[in-house]
Each structure stands twice: as structure tokens, then as C-alpha cells.
Amino acid sequence: MAALLQCISHSPMKGYVDPSPAIVSDVEVAIARMRKELVDFDPEVIFLFAPDHYNGFFLDVMPQFCVGIAATSVGDYRTTPGPINVPREIARSCAEHLISNDIDVAISYRMQVDHGMVQPLEELMGGLNAYPVVPLFVNGVAPPLISIRRARLFGAAVGEYAKKLNKRCLFIGSGGLSHNPPVPQIDTATEEFAEFLIAGRNPSPERRAARQQRTKDAAIRFAAGDSQLHPINSVWDEAFMADLVNQDWGALDAYRNSEITEQAGISTHEAKSWVAAHAAMNAATSGGYMAEVRYYKAIPEWIVGYGAMAGSAEQAT
């Protein structure tokens, strides 16, 4: 089989609270290079690992992993709303493979996804329906959280399934890197916000707009240095990406959730989507691939350590 790997950060603040034009241009150049590689590769199926931010998954029932048999974008932060082109039989077969191999995934015939999944679709392939996409939710924001090891095993099982398809498969990881946006935790939230975290599906346009405005205000304060949010940790980000480049699965398995939160911020756990994508690539190619860092910069305006990585089996020597 032929396989391609792409991992990229996302931020809802893109286009709302931007860094300097030079930084925006550098990010766009990195994305354009990855977009061209995707188009040239022409994937027959995409496996997209991504988190959610209390737009589709809530604490009434919060799975650690979920395979979307059908999925729709909620259209938050000016992302495109509407159905995603999910190859239903492949998605269902993938879920069956995972469950039969001791990965206890949930499935959804009505998955709702937000910018965490939609931004890479828009930026790398121009929209929701350009290619068949199997959406793979990885819980990255709602404790209790899986370990990096479990994310790796999940991704590896997806990669083993993809290998059997004998198709051109693209593995995308969306999320991270270090960041701690203003998302209340259930234990400290007000009663009203706790109810939202539990059952906040399909909010009114006014309520969604108010929530998004709070995030914009927080980004402005964070960029100005007037914020109590956890700082971006470039040292952590670069060490994490180096472990991925080196395929140092032992080092990655040794990461502890408490240390990730303390060193890099609670939402850094989104980076487990990158681990899953790399593990899928590793399994699909039997380790015969190489990955490289394409871009990294701490971007406070976007409240994130923003990174991009890519890899292909053809690069391996």
C-alpha cells in the first residue's frame, strides 16, 4: 500500500486574532506544501484523528475514541457546516476491526465535529467532500483522559486495518501542541456551564457567538501578556515532535498525563491525535517511513504552539 502522514495544529482564532503577516505567511507556506503533497498523492481514503471542544461530544457520554460512520460539521468559528464525505462501509469495517482487536471504540451514525476536524479538511484539501474521510475522534479535553500509550495502540490498530485495504491511505493528526485555552473543567465550572459541558449540543446562534467571543477576548489578553492561562511551552513541543520523528515509542509511552498538563497545559492532550496518526503510519508501513517537522512556532494570538509534520513511506531509506 501507499501511505502519507500529515499532522497539523488547529486554532479557532485563525482569522480572528492573528499574529504578524510574516508569521501568517510562513504558516500558509507550510500548509500549501502539505496541500500539494496531498493532491499529488491523491488519497483513496483519509483517516483523520482529531479532538472535539464540547461541540459534538459532551459529558453525558464521553468516549475516549469514536469512529464516525456518518458525520456533520457544526460550522463553529466560520468553518464550513454540513455533511462530511464518510465512506460508510470502510468506516464501519474499520470499527469492527478495532473492536475485534481489543480497541473498545464507540461508533456514531450522527457524529458532530467542530473546527478540530474541519480546519485540516479545509486547509489541506479545500473542503469537506474532496476525498473520502473516516473521522476518528480522540478525547483530548475531558478528563479522565487516555494515556499516550492507548492513543498509540488505537492508531496502530487503525493502521493495521488500513494496510489490509491496499489503497492509498492518508493519516492526518489534528490538534495541539501546547496550549491551555479558557475551557472550564466540570469540577470548577458554574452550575450553568457545567450543564453545558454535560449536554450542550446544538446551542442557539447567540449562545455559540457568546462562547466564541469569550475565546477571542481571551486570545487578545493572552497575546498581550495579560492572562493567567498556562504559557505555551516550546521546549515541550519540540521534544514531543523529536520523539515522533525518532519513532521513539518507548519515550512517548512514558509521558504521564499529569506531567503533560503541568508542563504544557490541559488541552495539550489533543496532541495524542498526532501520536495516533504516527502510530497508524508506522503500522501501515511496517515501520518503513520517515517523518519530519515542517513548521513550528509559539503563536500566542492563536493560544497554541503551532506545528506541522509530514512523512511518507517513499522517504524511508
Swiss-Prot record:
Signal peptide range: none
Catalysed reaction, written as an equation: 3-(2,3-dihydroxyphenyl)propanoate + O2 = (2Z,4E)-2-hydroxy-6-oxonona-2,4-dienedioate + H(+); (2E)-3-(2,3-dihydroxyphenyl)prop-2-enoate + O2 = (2Z,4E,7E)-2-hydroxy-6-oxonona-2,4,7-trienedioate + H(+)
InterPro entries in the cross-refs: DHPP/DHXA_dioxygenase, Xdiol_dOase_suB
Family: Belongs to the LigB/MhpB extradiol dioxygenase family.
Taxonomic classification: Bacteria, Pseudomonadati, Pseudomonadota, Betaproteobacteria, Rhodocyclales
Gene3D superfamilies according to UniProt: LigB-like (3.40.830.10)
Catalytic residues identified in the record: 115 (proton donor), 179 (proton acceptor)
A biological process from GO: 3-phenylpropionate catabolic process
Superkingdom in the source lineage: Bacteria
Protein name: 2,3-dihydroxyphenylpropionate/2,3-dihydroxicinnamic acid 1,2-dioxygenase 2
GO molecular function annotation: 3-carboxyethylcatechol 2,3-dioxygenase activity; ferrous iron binding
Function summary: Catalyzes the non-heme iron(II)-dependent oxidative cleavage of 2,3-dihydroxyphenylpropionic acid and 2,3-dihydroxicinnamic acid into 2-hydroxy-6-ketononadienedioate and 2-hydroxy-6-ketononatrienedioate, respectively.
Subunit structure and binding partners: Homotetramer.
Keyword annotations: Aromatic hydrocarbons catabolism, Dioxygenase, Iron, Oxidoreductase
UniProt EC number: 1.13.11.16
Cofactor(s) needed for function: Fe(2+)
Pathway entry: Aromatic compound metabolism; 3-phenylpropanoate degradation
Annotated gene: mhpB2
Pfam families recorded: LigB
